[in-house]
């Protein structure tokens, strides 16, 4: 069921071919949504045809807040809410040739759209353009600080994008948009189908959005990584028998690495009665050495030595909850059950 309320912004410009519809999705984002909508109005050098906010049954008054900013509002009432449902409702209602997708907890950089459109208009084979997303409050927690580096990708043609991205509406039409059955990984899955049509996904060296992760606890960290594991398993299974078995290698690597850390830690703990603390010491030394190696390889992402080391440790230990997420998907698939949305905020 979908309710649509249209409020046309006075800032909406002409109907030029390069005009853009902005689709923002959210659920109970509150002040973060206000900051997002305010940032859109600061966009430089681009014609914005409309701003559409798609709300997934918020209880905090987000739809009214969006209307106060002049956005068109679509409220969806899915039994099993997913980001894909909101994004599809938004782009199908939009009228511009280009669609900018934003999450409601992000802040748009004023120059991103101009840079992204330049790439789109210069190469018709580019179907999606995205830039750098960074955390707005890395100082708020060690999780924010470390996971901020997860957003850093090298510029160039890539396999997939994230949720903040500029896409061609025509290509969305050819692919039927996002898969609404996925609780996570819907952007990479769509990008795999887009690339199969001969289009390119481009990551540009340009600030795109600031993001408010709001991760303050280990429980949140665990659930986020578990959701990633679920996405790896479900998306890779869809393409496992194709010419391009997307994420198949990542899925196997996650299983091996996650299994290694679990089994090695268990073996070290079990052997304590016979060997004392030596096995645990060796396990810790191995983790530190591999974390330092990963930190050195990721030094191009910037940040200080301590954050890079923690990021290196994260790159290894996150494999454990990722493995659990993959196993949860496998179990549910065997039982014929669909997993509900895994939220960490």
State what each model feature region is.
Residues 77-94, 115, 159, 163:
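Glycine-rich, basic loop-to-helix element that forms the pyrophosphate-binding segment
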Residues 99:
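Short aromatic/hydrophobic "clamp" motif used to bind/position activated sugar donors
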Residues 107-142, 212:
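Conserved donor NDP-sugar-binding/catalytic core segment of glycosyltransferases
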Residues 258-331:
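Membrane-embedded multi-pass helical conduit in multi-pass membrane proteins
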Residues 38-48:
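Short, acidic, metal-binding catalytic loop of nucleotide-sugar glycosyltransferases
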Residues 134-136, 150-173, 183, 189, ...:
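A recurrent flexible, glycine/aromatic-enriched loop bordering the glycosyltransferase active site
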Residues 39, 55-63, 106:
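A conserved acidic beta->alpha catalytic loop
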Residues 181-182, 188-246:
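Catalytic donor/gating beta->alpha subdomain of glycosyltransferases that bind UDP-sugars
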């Amino acid at each position: 069921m979908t309710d649509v309320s249209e409020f046309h912004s006075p800032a909406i410009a002409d109907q030029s071919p390069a005009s853009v519809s902005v689709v923002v999705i959210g659920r109970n984002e509150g002040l973060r949504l206000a900051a997002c909508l305010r940032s859109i109005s600061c966009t430089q050098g681009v014609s914005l045809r409309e701003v559409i906010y798609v709300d997934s049954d918020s209880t905090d008054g987000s739809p009214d807040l969006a209307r106060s900013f002049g956005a068109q509002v679509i409220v969806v009432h899915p039994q099993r809410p997913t980001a894909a449902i909101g994004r599809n409702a938004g782009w199908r209602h939009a009228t511009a040739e280009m669609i900018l997708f934003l999450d409601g907890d992000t802040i748009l950089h004023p120059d991103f759209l101009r840079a992204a459109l330049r790439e789109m208009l210069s190469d018709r084979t580019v179907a999606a353009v995205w830039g750098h997303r960074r955390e707005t409050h890395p100082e708020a927690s060690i999780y924010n600080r470390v996971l901020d580096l997860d957003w850093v990708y090298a510029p160039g043609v890539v396999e997939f994008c994230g949720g903040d991205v500029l896409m061609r509406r025509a290509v969305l039409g050819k692919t039927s948009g996002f898969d609404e059955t996925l609780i996570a990984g819907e952007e990479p899955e769509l990008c795999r189908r887009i690339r199969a049509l001969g289009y390119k996904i481009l990551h540009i060296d340009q600030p795109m959005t600031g993001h408010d992760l709001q991760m303050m606890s280990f429980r949140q960290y665990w659930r986020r990584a578990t959701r990633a594991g679920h996405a790896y398993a479900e998306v890779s299974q869809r393409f496992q028998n194709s010419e391009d078995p997307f994420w198949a290698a990542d899925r196997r690597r996650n299983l091996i690495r996650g299994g290694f850390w679990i089994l090695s830690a268990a073996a070290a703990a079990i052997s304590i009665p016979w060997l004392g603390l030596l096995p645990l010491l060796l396990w810790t030394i191995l983790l530190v050495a591999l974390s330092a190696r990963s930190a050195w390889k990721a030094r191009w992402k910037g940040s200080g030595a301590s954050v890079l080391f923690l990021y290196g440790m994260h790159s290894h230990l996150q494999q454990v909850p990722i493995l659990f997420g993959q196993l949860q998907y496998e179990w549910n698939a065997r039982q014929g059950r669909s997993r509900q949305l895994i939220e960490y905020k």
